[in-house]
């Protein structure tokens, strides 16, 4: 599901809210989440999951086209860990 599909879905479920209002709300939520991660904060949404940053050590990688070694610098990457409730909802074996 893309961001625009999410917005359309939310508008379809609640006709009293305008598309522009939903679009602004979704954009604002995503912007606040991005800013929180940018400042090093952890985001926890109970029942859904948590977003945090993971530090990646510098390492040597390979260019898949040429096979040449490439030095990759250390960096922080966003990480999502699904909450228990979300894991249970998507578990098709349960």
From Swiss-Prot:
Pfam family, one: Bac_DNA_binding
One of the record's GO cellular component terms: chromosome
Keyword tags: DNA recombination, DNA-binding, Transcription, Transcription regulation, Translation regulation
Gene Ontology MF terms: DNA binding; structural constituent of chromatin
Domain of life: Bacteria
GO biological process, alphabetically ordered: DNA recombination; regulation of DNA-templated transcription; regulation of translation
Family listed: Belongs to the bacterial histone-like protein family.
Alphabetical list of HAMAP family matching this protein: IHF_beta
Record's subunit section: Heterodimer of an alpha and a beta chain.
Role of this protein: This protein is one of the two subunits of integration host factor, a specific DNA-binding protein that functions in genetic recombination as well as in transcriptional and translational control.
NCBIfam families: hip, PRK00199.1
Protein name, entry field: Integration host factor subunit beta
Record lineage: Bacteria, Pseudomonadati, Pseudomonadota, Gammaproteobacteria, Pasteurellales
Gene: ihfB
